[in-house]
């Protein structure tokens, strides 16, 4: 099971691969859409890659609730438990 720091680092790598954003730009308080400028198609790719990386399921109806990086980290952390 990954720690929250490991989840954040893993998400940063996934966002970097999908968008080209520097991993340092992916911080807990950042909004996926407003701060990181991630569109819905890229977000779905990020979600699928996160599901594979962390061996969790993120239901489609939950994706809209993942507004910030911290939301995603917390969801993945809870889903691993």
Swiss-Prot record:
Q: Which GO cellular component does the record give, naming just one?
A: cytosol
One GO MF annotation is: acyl carrier activity
* Cellular compartments annotated: Cytoplasm
Which coarse location class applies to the principal site listed for this UniProt protein? cytoplasm
The alphabetical list of record keywords is: Cytoplasm, Fatty acid biosynthesis, Fatty acid metabolism, Lipid biosynthesis, Lipid metabolism, Phosphopantetheine, Phosphoprotein
Residue(s) carrying O-(pantetheine 4'-phosphoryl)serine? 40
Domain Carrier, by residue range, is: 2-80
PTM comment for this protein? Answer: 4'-phosphopantetheine is transferred from CoA to a specific serine of apo-ACP by AcpS. This modification is essential for activity because fatty acids are bound in thioester linkage to the sulfhydryl of the prosthetic group.
Q: Which GO terms describe its biological process?
A: lipid A biosynthetic process
Pathway membership of this protein?
Answer: Lipid metabolism; fatty acid biosynthesis
Note the PANTHER family from the entry: ACYL CARRIER PROTEIN, CARRIER DOMAIN-CONTAINING PROTEIN
Q: What does this protein do?
A: Carrier of the growing fatty acid chain in fatty acid biosynthesis.
Q: What family does the entry list?
A: Belongs to the acyl carrier protein (ACP) family.
The protein depicted here goes by the name Acyl carrier protein
Species of the source: Kocuria rhizophila (strain ATCC 9341 / DSM 348 / NBRC 103217 / DC2201)
